[in-house]
Amino acid sequence: MARIAGVDLPKRKRVEIGLTYIYGIGRSTSRQILNKLSIDYDTKVDQLTETEINAIRNAVTNEHKVEGELRTEVSMNIKRLMDLGCYRGLRHRKSLPCHGQRTSTNARTRKGPKRTAVKKKGAAKKK
């Protein structure tokens, strides 16, 4: 099993797909890496030689921010926005969408599950 950037790549998948298991590498980045190293996309991960695995490992770690390094950079960017107090930072702080989507009805993923309104016992009875 190939281990690149702290992630075990699945043996039976194609290399192009296997590389996308690494946080920060998608299909297009995976293809760029494989083109540069002249490795066929359709090669299975378990068919890679040690030299190919080392070449991929070097290309991923040296040229791209992946896994922990990328996660910390993203979280620091969000923290910076929150500290600045700009609109996007405020939206992050309130756990609301920051790209202009409507929140009256949608945005359940960001806002969390619905909280039902509970009536007070004293307010319900009027004489």
UniProtKB/Swiss-Prot annotation:
One of its GO terms (biological process) is translation. One of its GO terms (molecular function) is rRNA binding. Residues 108-127 have a biased composition (Basic residues). The keyword Signal does not apply. It comes from the Bacteria. Transmembrane segments: none annotated. Residues 96-127 are annotated as: Disordered. One of its GO terms (cellular component) is small ribosomal subunit. Located at the top of the head of the 30S subunit, it contacts several helices of the 16S rRNA. In the 70S ribosome it contacts the 23S rRNA (bridge B1a) and protein L5 of the 50S subunit (bridge B1b), connecting the 2 subunits; these bridges are implicated in subunit movement. Contacts the tRNAs in the A and P-sites. Belongs to the universal ribosomal protein uS13 family. HAMAP family: Ribosomal_uS13. This is Small ribosomal subunit protein uS13.
